[in-house]
Amino acid sequence: MIKIRETKEDLIKQTRLFEVFSRHLNLSFNQFSSFSKKYRIDGYCYDIKSKDIVCWVECKWYNNKAHCFLNVPKFNELISLSEVTSLPSYLLFREHNRWGYVLLHDGDKVVCDYKTKLMGGTPKGRVANSDDIEPLIAINKSNIVWGS
């Protein structure tokens, strides 16, 4: 049986990443609930005045080295949302004490380099799931843009 594994700490870390990224873009953000039945991704950034959605976002918090992996359904959702809305999608992450992002789709086409690999594992402190080793989208780290 697959279990929802996001903890309160995970959601707090996501919020911190959204705050940094949205401030960098001069936007506001909305974070989807872990229990959302509509979306797998973490949320989006928007213009508070016009209410226009500006981009789609998935967050990853790495205590050490960034892996830049996404499971195939999340990657598919981000790409599909970008194709339907013509808005960009990002993988936003923290590595050590810095943050960065990868532009996955620019609203027109997929712009990141990636491979599909069989990999994964159970993160420390998480409940093991039967699908922890799975096909993952491994994004080339040369695509990373580091924030300030």
Residue ranges of each PLM-predicted region?
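Acidic-basic catalytic patches of nuclease active cores, encompassing PD-(D/E)XK
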Residues: M1-S36, V84
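Active-site-adjacent loop/helix micro-motif of nuclease/hydrolase catalytic cores
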Residues: N63-F75
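Conserved catalytic cores of phosphodiester-cleaving nucleases, focusing on short active-site segments
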Residues: G43-N64
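Nucleic-acid nuclease catalytic cores
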Residues: S82-D108
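Beta-rich catalytic cores
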Residues: Y39
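Short His-Asn-centered micro-motif
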Residues: S33, C59-K60, L92-E95
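Intrinsically disordered, low-complexity terminal regions enriched in charged/polar residues
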Residues: G100-S148
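Basic, amphipathic alpha-helical patches used to engage nucleic acids or provide basic targeting signals
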Residues: V72-T85
